[in-house]
Amino acid sequence: MRQPFNKVLVALKPWQGGLPLSVYHARFLAENLGAQLRLMSCVYEPEVSLGMLKGEAEALAAQVGLVESERAVLAELAASMKDWGVEAECKVCWGHPAEDVILAEIERWGADLLVLGTHQAGSRPHTRLAQVDWQLMRSCPCPMLLARDPQFEGYRTVLAAVDPLHRHAEPEGLDRSILGIASTLATASASNLLVGHVYPDPESFALASSVEVLPGVFYGDRKSTRLNSSHWITSRMPSSA
């Protein structure tokens, strides 16, 4: 069963210059899924917020100025997307931490998909993800797409990673949801859909006793595991995938 994406939320980072790479992916999805698109940005300045708590008129004016400045940036971005034939609305929020503001907007608007861009390669040691990204990956209530490459012309292959044997106590229906999301993206982009299940080789583990069994480690042979996994996947694949 495919999962519809009617509302796509693109969370932009105010400090990023130029055309955010997440916009390329969002534009493609909006065009091919017929989804409603919303660009959002979160702005916040601690000193301004403190001044507002004290009732300072200057701080309130500064807050309005920051929000309006970011709104103008989003409006310009939305206008450029309109030239591509995609309509996008804009939303600027004030708050901290950014992940909480984004999560609140997802719930308020009822977003079906969150699109977020990573940092440029080399801008952060060892990773292209910020703390905001990690927190959203942990708590986002809807599917989340992390875009990393601005040179984007569509998805050639969509990979759905599932665990039919449920060795890690996944939530009920998680694999079905993954298959539905992957099928939706693959169909919309006319790409190949691959479903994969990766499991440890029993021969790779030398267990001293039956007590020393870790999550994901099991007793069994590769042939039966592969057959069980393949049967589960094929029985739940969308009929037209």
Spans of model-derived segments:
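Single conserved hydrophobic/aromatic residue that forms the stacking wall/gate
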Residues: 223, 227-241
